[in-house]
């Protein structure tokens, strides 16, 4: 007997691995089927989730930590500081709704950070934090933003680069 996990079929077993259970819960598969589309309907490459993260960067170029910091503190874009405090004495009025980002680079790997920024609802469906790169399935979006991610793939990588410096 086998069960389907995403596009993959795996043998049913009384002994499931943590990764298999996570993939089942998140609807992810370890590998996409041959001929799978390289982009979704909105032109956004699909996220390849493995275990509890996205191991591969979303872009061919490395993220820039300085640009990532600018995005995190920018009230008009990512606006992370609305809910999260960061260890920056120059920053005033950071939020405390979400966890502090101080030391996040020691607590989470880049792959885990990438998933949380790109599609946080996969990690915590009850979270108020938006999925910054996901567009599919979002139904309460203002018309000018419909079908567009909050952050581009390179901006996600910039944010991840900055978060990994917070040790």
Where do the language-model regions lie?
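Sequence context surrounding c-type heme c attachment/ligation sites in exported
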Residues: 66-81, 92-95, 146-154
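Boundary at the C-terminal end of the N-terminal hydrophobic targeting segment
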Residues: 30-41
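N-terminal secretory signal peptides that target proteins for export/translocation
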Residues: 1-13
